[in-house]
Amino acid sequence: MDWIDNIVSAWTGHRKFAEFLVDKMKPNVIVELGVDYGFSSFVFANALKNQNGIIYGIDLFEGDIHTGIRNTYNSVLNNIKNHNLTKIKIIVGDFTEVSKTWNLPINILHIDGLHTYEAVKNDYENWSKFVEKDGIIIFHDVVAFEEVANFFKEVSGWYKLFFTHSAGLGILTKNIELRNEIINNFSNVYNFEVNPL
């Protein structure tokens, strides 16, 4: 157990998966839509410490109807500074507005903002175009929020995996090798469903 595990988060059960993705994919760019207190951002940043990649955490840091209205910005910055996380860049902004000027290809896109159908759809439509062909998109809370699950079910043209623990994690990739690696490494550890392309 380390300092990251002291952060209360519904994402804690996905830590090993995030570390696996970074180790397997060697991503140059990870984008996280929704930082909150930073658990998943810190996990990715920590996993990147011996690599060249960067995680960009994007958030307004105002909270929302699901998390409650709260400002976590200073807490996130303090953890970045106190734990020397050099592989993370925080962008304070609206997801849609930031996407309008975004110009980097993305290896891992993590969608974990407002959990309404419209918001998740908007995040996907604005950001999935930047994901590289061998990349991956992950949606948190596909079990905890029906509207996230409904949108995830509607997305087509990707291999889908669906973890059921820790509020659920929906996974999209067009990379069959990565899909198979995930199945081989996690089928004995977690319950999940596999859907074809």
Regions found by a protein language model. Give the residues of each.
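S-adenosylmethionine/decaboxylated-SAM
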Residues: D2-L197
